Amino acid sequence: SSAASDVYKRQLYTMGKAILQLRQRGEPDGFLYSDEALFAKSIRRPMVAHFKPDYAPDYLLCCNYICHLAVFKKALWEQLGGERPECDGSQDHDLFLRLLEKTGGAAHVPQVLYYWRVHAGSTSGGADAKPYVAAAAKKALADHLTRTGRTGTVEDGLFPSTYRVKWDIVGEPKVSILIPNKDHTEDLEKCLHSIWTKTEWEHFEVI
C-alpha cells in the first residue's frame, strides 16, 4: 500500500541520516533502534505508541524494550552467526543481547519508525498468544549472564513478558541507602526506624 511504502522510505531515510550523524560525531554506529506503534486495521490509525528510553542495559534484562525497528551492521550479524534456533520465540531479545556484548551500547532514534499489526497469534497481541516466549527469553538472558561473567537466576517478572534477574551476592558488599529528605523530620524518622528494625543486612550506610 502507499502508506506502507511511505513508512519504508521514512525508515531508510531516518536511520540512514542517524547513522551519518553518529559518524560525524565520532560515535558508535553499529546498532540503532527506534520507537514503534501498534495498529489493528489501518496503519494511519495506531492504537498505541511505544516511546522508548535511550540505551538502558538494566531495563533490557527485564524485557525486550528495543524490539522494532532495529538496525545493525551486517558484519556484526555475520560475526554472531545470526539468530539462535534454541531461542525461537525470543530470538530478537537474544540477538540484541549478543549484539550489545560486541557494541557496548545502542543509539536510540526517538521517532516512531515501525508499525506493528496486532492480531490474535502475534506476540504484539499479548504474551498468551505464544506461551513458549517466556522460556526462550529466560534462556537468552541466562546465557547472556554466563557470557558476560555474571551470576544470577532469571525469574518471571510481575507482568507478562517481563523478567527479573536475582543476582548472586558475592561476599558482603556495602549497601548505600540514599534518602532524599528536606524539612520532613517525621518521615525521615519513620524511614530510619524501618531500616534499623527490619534489615538483616549489617554492612550498610545511610546517606
Task: Describe each model-derived feature in a short phrase.
Residues 1-8:
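Short, small-residue-biased leader/transition segments that mark boundaries at the very start
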Residues 10-47, 119:
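Conserved donor NDP-sugar-binding/catalytic core segment of glycosyltransferases
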Residues 45-75, 87-88:
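A recurrent flexible, glycine/aromatic-enriched loop bordering the glycosyltransferase active site
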Residues 81-97, 132:
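Donor nucleotide-sugar recognition loop
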Residues 85-87, 97-115, 121, 139-157, ...:
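Catalytic donor-sugar/metal-binding loop of nucleotide-sugar-dependent glycosyltransferases
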Residues 94, 173-178, 205:
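Cell-envelope/extracellular polymer assembly enzymes that use nucleotide-activated donors
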Residues 179-190, 201:
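Active-site beta-to-alpha loop of glycosyltransferases that engages the nucleotide-sugar donor
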Residues 193-203:
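Short, acidic, metal-binding catalytic loop of nucleotide-sugar glycosyltransferases
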